[in-house]
């Protein structure tokens, strides 16, 4: 029994340790975000609300059936009679019950029909806004995810630089003790080491800040993330021209589709406002029965009534309200037209900017790779010169800083390239989960 209990505890401990230490990849973080991000959930709720609004607008054109029942009692005290017989004081009472069933149906109402069309278009627009929120989430998750990795890389470089400077500080102290260098070199190395210690503190805080930023999207703290595989990482220059991407964006960019829908809705709003000048026709049928019970009466009078009719309403003058509503709708249409023009310009700029950034990142990446190689060679040469007395400790410290700055720039460029590629796809409206899946294949367990 003790062995079984011990085995169970060990198994639970191992499982717990495995769960805690297991790193999350980009897709796992994204899936968590899709279920918890307030922005996406809000967009989904708004899409649901617009779908219900469409159903409500449709209900205006469907038959309406209602039932009404009323009950009343009447008590009367007073004199009754005529001049021949005289007046006699008496009391009477009665009660009545009336039930009415009414069916109504809109036969013609241009405003209601226009309202249904507008509701349908707004429902489709809200679905597009939901899709846009999902695309934006892909970029935000990638930004937050790789920002954490970038800050972790920076912390690693800062710590490596600190260790290198610490080693150089110890060597400088030893050289000073045997008279091979001046005390100023020791002070210079100590100053650089102190700076590296401060940089490490700042870098550690940046890591936690980045993790917290990611948590605001997913609602969960991510302690360990898969890292970018630098051994297999490569950049690819776009095979199409920027004008080709612009053409795709004009057809598929979600923000542009939303703006176009707003213009279309604004046009329909003009028609709905003008519908106030047109007559409306409605159908109504009702059936009612009434039952009256009078005290002392021999019978119970009952009456049944059936009514069927059409109601025509013709607007003649409404104080200028309809014309004012039409003018307002036309002004809103002009505003929507300007929004569409602005959206077209913004999307063109976004595509060109993202395209140029990707092209620049590809070229810069190759240059930074060479910069790291050159910085490593420069540091080796400077350290050799310091050993023979032709270079100072200041030169060594500068070369050390240059090397880790080059490594840091190269690492940051990798993340920048990935994000630039995603933003280009977002600008063209082609961004999807499949893009994250492709990136996720280039990750390794952190």
Features from the language model and the residues they span:
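Bacterial N-terminal signal peptides that target proteins for export
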Residues: 1-8
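Periplasmic alpha-helical coiled-coil/stalk elements that build and connect Gram-negative outer-membrane
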Residues: 3, 136-248, 354-357, 361, ...
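Bacterial Sec-pathway N-terminal export signals of envelope proteins
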Residues: 21-70, 76, 221-222, 228-263, ...
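Small/polar (Gly/Ser/Thr/Ala-rich) solvent-exposed segments
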Residues: 41, 64-84, 89, 93, ...
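Amphipathic alpha-helical coiled-coil segments
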Residues: 42-57, 133-157, 167, 174, ...
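Hydrophobic, lipid-facing positions within transmembrane beta-strands of outer-membrane proteins
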Residues: 97-103, 245, 306-312
């Amino acid at each position: 029994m003790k062995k079984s209990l011990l085995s169970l505890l060990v198994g639970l401990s191992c499982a717990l340790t495995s769960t805690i230490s297991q790193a999350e990849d980009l897709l796992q973080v994204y899936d968590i975000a899709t279920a918890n991000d307030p922005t996406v959930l809000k967009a989904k709720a708004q899409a649901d609300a617009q779908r219900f609004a469409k159903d409500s607008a449709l209900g205006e054109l469907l038959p309406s059936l209602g039932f009404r029942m009323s009950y009343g009692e009447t008590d009367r005290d007073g004199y009754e009679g005529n001049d021949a017989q005289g007046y006699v004081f008496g009391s009477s009472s009665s009660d009545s019950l009336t039930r009415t069933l009414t069916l109504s149906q809109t036969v013609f109402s241009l405003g209601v029909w226009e309202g249904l069309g507008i509701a349908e278009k707004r429902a489709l627009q809200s679905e597009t806004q939901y899709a846009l929120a999902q695309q934006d989430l892909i970029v935000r998750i990638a930004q937050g995810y790789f920002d954490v990795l970038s800050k972790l890389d920076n912390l690693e470089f800062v710590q490596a630089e600190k260790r290198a400077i610490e080693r150089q500080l110890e060597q400088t102290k030893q050289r000073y003790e045997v008279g091979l260098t001046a005390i100023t070199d020791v002070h210079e190395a100590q100053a650089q080491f102190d700076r590296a210690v401060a940089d490490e503190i700042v870098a550690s805080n940046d890591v936690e800040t980045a993790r917290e930023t990611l948590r605001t999207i997913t609602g969960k703290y991510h302690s360990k993330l898969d890292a970018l595989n630098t051994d297999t990482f490569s950049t690819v220059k776009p095979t199409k021209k920027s004008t080709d991407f612009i053409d795709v964006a004009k057809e598929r960019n979600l923000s542009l589709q939303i703006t176009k829908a707003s213009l279309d809705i604004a046009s329909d709003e003009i028609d709905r406002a003008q519908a106030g000048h047109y007559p409306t026709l409605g159908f109504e049928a009702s059936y009612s029965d009434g039952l009256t019970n009078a005290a002392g009466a021999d019978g119970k009078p009952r009456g049944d009534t059936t009514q069927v009719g059409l109601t025509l309403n013709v607007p003649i003058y409404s104080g200028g309200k309809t014309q004012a509503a039409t003018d307002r709708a036309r002004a809103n249409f002009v505003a929507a037209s300007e929004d569409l023009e602005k959206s077209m310009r913004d999307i063109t700029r976004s595509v060109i900017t993202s395209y140029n950034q990707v092209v620049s990142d590809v070229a810069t990446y190759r240059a930074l790779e060479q910069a790291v190689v050159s910085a490593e060679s420069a540091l080796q040469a400077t350290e050799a010169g310091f050993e023979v007395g032709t270079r100072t400790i200041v030169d060594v410290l500068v070369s050390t800083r240059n090397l880790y700055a080059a490594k840091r720039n190269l690492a940051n460029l990798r993340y920048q390239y990935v994000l630039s590629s995603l933003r280009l796809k977002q600008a063209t409206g082609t961004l999807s989960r499949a893009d994250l899946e492709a990136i996720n294949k280039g990750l390794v367990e952190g």
